[in-house]
Structure formats: structure tokens, C-alpha cells
Regions:
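Amphipathic, Lys/Arg-enriched alpha-helical "gate/interface" segment within cytosolic domains
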Residues: 2-176
């Protein structure tokens, strides 16, 4: 019996309307829902994680010529990345910016840590050459309400906030 033809990861990424978990290891998860990339960071980003993010981003943007959006959930207490990783993240952001409608960071928690992380994220994107909309919020519901507007404006793909929230929560609930 012949094995079925191998599936193209890019085709899988393009066809998915349910939440697809693509990577889940070492405190870093990558998932997709429609043409939205969903990321969960529960530990400090490492060069290896950024390489995985870059690899995935390349395939995902190729699978979605209409454009994509990205939501990054950063768990309470996840350490700020060091300089090497900050530079790598900036490079990835710059490399894929022309394909991105919007980026939303959900920074869980409050206080000094959350303020420091928000400042880091603002600086990361402020210094990059970006044409996408950027939003930083403190909860998943706020992200699910904000993303559909800039996403539809750029990609012409309509997202239902309640469905988007469910997809984000699926990824977030992987760890607790």
C-alpha cells in the first residue's frame, strides 16, 4: 500500500480554520488560526526560540499572500530577553513586517515587570521599519477585540472576536 502524498506544511497553514498547534516545547508555543499566528512565551526567549519563530513566520507568510497578524501572549513573570535575543527579535520583525497587518502583545500581570516588558516591546517595534499596527494590552479579551479591525483592513479577512478569543485561550491554556 502506498503512503499518501506528503502534505505541504505551507498548505496546512493556509487551509486551517481551526486552531492548529505547530510547536509546543520549552515554554514556547506556536499555533495558527485562520491567517493569525498565535504565540505563547512562558520563559525568556532564546536564540533557538527566535530561530523557530523565524522559520515558522517564513512558511506562514508564504502560505498567506493576503497577509497575517500575530498575537504574542507573554506569561506573567517571563524574563526580559537579553541583548542578543532582542537583536534577533528585531531582525525577525523587520524581515517579515511587509506581510503583517498587525501585532498584538498580551502582557499578563502588572507592576514593574509588566511596565518594563511593555517598554521593551514598544522599543522593539518603534526602532523597526514597520507598516503594521501595534497594540499592547493586558488580557486576551482586549486582544480579541482589537485585532479584527486592523487585520481586516489590511488582509480583507474578517475575524469574529469571540472565535479569536477562543483560539487565543486554547493556546494560553496549554500551560498553567
Amino acid at each position: 500500500m502506498l503512503d499518501p502524498a506528503p502534505r505541504s506544511p505551507a498548505k496546512d497553514l493556509a487551509d486551517s480554520t481551526s486552531t492548529q498547534l505547530l510547536h509546543d516545547a520549552d515554554g514556547f508555543s506556536i499555533a495558527t488560526w485562520k491567517n493569525v499566528a498565535l504565540h505563547l512565551w512562558t520563559v525568556a526567549a532564546t536564540p533557538e526560540m527566535v530561530a523557530k519563530l523565524d522559520e515558522f513566520s517564513l512558511a506562514f507568510t508564504r502560505a498567506h499572500p493576503e497577509g497575517i497578524s500575530a498575537i504574542h501572549v507573554i506569561a506573567k513573570g517571563a524574563p526580559l530577553p537579553g541583548k542578543e535575543v532582542r537583536d534577533l527579535l528585531r531582525d525577525v520583525s523587520d524581515r517579515h513586517a511587509k506581510h503583517v497587518a498587525c501585532v498584538c502583545h498580551v502582557v499578563e500581570g502588572s507592576g514593574f515587570w509588566a511596565s518594563a516588558l511593555q517598554s521593551f516591546l514598544t522599543g522593539l517595534h518603534w526602532l523597526s521599519q514597520r507598516s503594521y499596527s501595534l497594540h499592547i494590552c493586558s488580557d486576551i479579551a482586549a486582544a480579541a477585540q482589537w485585532v479584527p479591525g486592523p487585520h481586516a483592513q489590511r488582509t480583507k479577512v474578517t475575524l469574529a472576536p469571540a472565535e479569536l478569543e477562543q483560539a487565543i485561550r486554547f493556546v494560553r491554556n496549554r500551560v498553567d
